[in-house]
Amino acid sequence: MSMGQRKKAYIAFALACNVSMLLLDEPTNGLDIPSKSVFRRLLAGYVDDSRMVVISTHQVADVERLLDSIVILDNMGVALAATTQEICSKLKFGHANERARAIYTESTIAGDLSVSINDDYEDTMLNIELLFNATTANRNAIAAIFNNK
């Protein structure tokens, strides 16, 4: 069996166990693109009020639309713990138009991206990778916004 086939078998077994809390460590590593799509569909159908899934991953793009809450850890502990709704209400993500107001900026092939305080209540798409980079680069500013210590 290939790594991807073994991973699919493990995931199928885990979901079939129908446990109230399922812990998944890097669940999409080794899966091809169609299998990742199937994984997202299965996971979306699995979670309900009686079942929770905790995912540890570096492949945030594979699961970011499925998340209700995000916890970012660093060597000092919990750097951020918030719901996706809370994050999007307090922060905005996008192109760096106002660098002076940005908490964090980074240059990409698509241009400069930023995280800034959402003081004008703009509705932007959560970018977990950008959030992670902002949190690790400017932990104190993020902690102050979310009242984390």
Predicted regions and their residues:
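Catalytic Walker B motif of ABC-type/P-loop ATPase nucleotide-binding domains
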Residues: L22-E26
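A short, surface-exposed alpha-helical micro-motif characterized by mixed small hydrophobic
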Residues: V63-R65
